[in-house]
Regions:
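C-terminal motif of bacterial Sec signal peptides marking the signal peptidase cleavage site
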Residues: 15-16
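Structural alpha/beta surface segment adjacent to cysteine/selenocysteine redox centers
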Residues: 92-113, 119-122
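Hydrophobic helical h-region of N-terminal Sec-dependent signal peptides
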Residues: 9-11
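Positively charged n-region of N-terminal signal peptides that target proteins for export
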Residues: 1-4
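Local sequence-structure signature of Cys/Sec-based thiol-disulfide redox active-site neighborhoods
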Residues: 42-79
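Thiol-based oxidoreductase modules, predominantly thioredoxin-like and allied folds used
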Residues: 79-99
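N-terminal leader/targeting and pre-domain segments
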Residues: 20-50, 138-141
Length: 141
């Protein structure tokens, strides 16, 4: 009887020690959203009534921390978020309310990266600054 129990117990012990299969999450890169990337000058010209314009820099630590969340949102909600790579032509401003209700690119600017505008009918309606505010907005949208 004892010999019969040894075999199943040994099998259970061996199986419990086997390495578990790890499910690896998909890692996205900005190249995965090339079709959703626009230039700063086109930020108010997208053919959509309502969308987010996400301004980022590939060298920005905070941008990289939320990169997976933002790209996933954009891929799941196609056509509702566009990526704007930061460049030296984008004005840096101090007052985050400055871009609100503006309908000309020349009147826009960002406080820093990451930043995100909500654009409705080619007018900036909201300005989100920083990783926490952006992730919160996309999570609640």
């Amino acid at each position: 009887m004892n010999k019969l129990l040894i075999l199943p117990i040994t099998a259970i012990l061996i199986l419990s020690c086997s390495p578990k299969k790890e499910t690896k999450a998909i890692e996205y890169d900005y190249s995965d959203v090339d079709d959703l990337t626009i230039f700063w000058n086109d930020i108010l010209s997208v053919e959509s009534d309502k969308y987010f314009a996400y301004i980022y820099s590939p060298t920005c630590g905070h941008c990289n921390e939320i990169k997976q969340d933002v790209i996933t949102y954009a891929l799941v909600n196609k056509g509702t978020l566009y990526f704007v790579p930061f460049n030296k032509m984008i004005p840096i401003i101090i007052d985050r309310t400055l871009p609100l209700e503006k309908d000309k690119v020349e009147d826009l600017g960002i406080v820093g990266t990451p930043s995100m505008f909500l654009v409705v009918n080619h007018v900036v309606k909201e300005n989100y600054v920083g990783k926490k505010e952006i992730v919160k907005t996309l999570t609640n949208d």
